[in-house]
């Protein structure tokens, strides 16, 4: 870590952003698991509604560059394939 003021500020910013990103990624994992569980239980109607919510969250995270846009697309694709089975 640097000693000049700008380097110290960047370190503080990186710490804050890292905490926020970890929180969002954790939330994404949780809602993806909930969607998977709804699909496995055969609750298609609920799963479809929840899939829309998950899709929106993934797109938002990709737009804010918390996850890569291709990763968001891949996760949405995999969930939709499972949902349509």
Curated annotation (Swiss-Prot):
GO MF entry, a single one: structural constituent of ribosome
Annotated source species: Borrelia turicatae (strain 91E135)
Role description: Binds directly to 16S ribosomal RNA.
Top-level taxon in the UniProt lineage: Bacteria
InterPro entries: Ribosomal_bS20, Ribosomal_bS20_sf
Protein name: Small ribosomal subunit protein bS20
Gene Ontology biological-process entries: translation
Similarity section: Belongs to the bacterial ribosomal protein bS20 family.
Pfam families from the UniProt entry: Ribosomal_S20p
Gene: rpsT
GO cellular component, one term: small ribosomal subunit
Assigned keywords, A-Z: Ribonucleoprotein, Ribosomal protein, RNA-binding, rRNA-binding
């Amino acid at each position: 870590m640097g000693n000049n003021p700008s380097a110290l500020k960047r370190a503080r910013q990186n710490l804050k952003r890292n905490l926020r990103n970890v929180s969002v990624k954790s939330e994404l994992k949780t809602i993806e698991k909930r969607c998977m569980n709804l699909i496995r239980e055969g609750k298609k109607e609920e799963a479809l509604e929840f899939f829309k919510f998950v899709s929106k969250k993934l797109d938002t995270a990709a737009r804010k560059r918390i996850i890569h846009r291709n990763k968001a697309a891949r996760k949405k694709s995999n969930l939709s394939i499972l949902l349509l089975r």
